[in-house]
Design a protein with these regions (language model features):
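MPN/JAMM (Mov34/JAB) isopeptidase/deubiquitinase module and associated MPN-bearing subunits/adaptors
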Residues: 2, 163-178
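A short acidic, glycine-rich active-site loop
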Residues: 136-145
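Short HxH-centered metal-ligating active-site micro-motif
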Residues: 71-136
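Short, conserved "active-site rim" segments that organize catalytic pockets and cofactor/ligand binding
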Residues: 20-21, 25, 40-94, 168-174
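A structural motif corresponding to the C-terminal end of an alpha-helix
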Residues: 107-110, 150-163
Length: 178
């Protein structure tokens, strides 16, 4: 065997060694993840229904964290929040909300539904055909009607659930709706 053939053979063996070593390291890194069983879902305090408005996603999370609910709630997001869960204009949204609530009760034993609508909601304008943000009192009344209607429907289907109704301003301030 010539010098050239010896070098080729060493290179081939070195590459084979590296390939096996890399595969072994990869397998050893994956093994714990594959052998570990997934964490069981724990009970959470509530299911939050809120609007999809990008302007308030961070404010909503901040609000929930400020209440001590970080990682303690399930979150359903529908355009219009309460209105999205009730509107006949988009019936699939109704179904989505109720199915998510059913699953949250089964998996996480939620005992409370928090419904968080917000001011200057574009979905209210699209679905109801009017810009309520121009008249704060009317906007409050319309949101309160939708929120209260959803609470009645939730309590009719799940009498043991507590339902909390909230309305958030664009600055993140939250007011309770009774």
């Amino acid at each position: 065997m010539g010098a050239h053939e010896i070098l080729d053979d060493r290179g081939r063996r070195r590459r084979e060694f590296l390939r096996v070593a890399v595969l072994g390291v990869g397998a050893s890194l994956l093994a714990p993840a594959l052998l570990r069983s997934p964490a069981r879902a724990a009970a959470v305090d509530a299911l939050l229904l809120s609007c999809m408005d990008y302007r308030l996603i961070a404010e909503t999370e901040r609000y929930m964290s400020g209440r001590g609910l970080r990682h303690k709630y399930d979150h359903v997001i529908l355009a219009g929040g309460a209105l999205g869960a009730l509107t006949e204009k988009y019936p699939a949204w109704n179904q989505t909300f109720w199915e998510h609530l059913d699953v949250a009760i089964q998996l996480h034993q939620v005992h409370k539904v928090i419904v968080l609508d917000h001011r200057d909601c574009g979905a209210y304008q699209v679905i109801l055909g009017e810009d309520f943000a121009k008249d704060r009192a009317k906007e409050t009344t319309v949101h309160a009607e939708q929120l209260q209607n959803l609470r009645k429907r939730i309590v009719a289907q799940y009498p043991s659930l507590e339902v909390e109704l909230l309305l958030m301003s664009l600055d993140g301030k939250v007011e309770k709706v009774s």
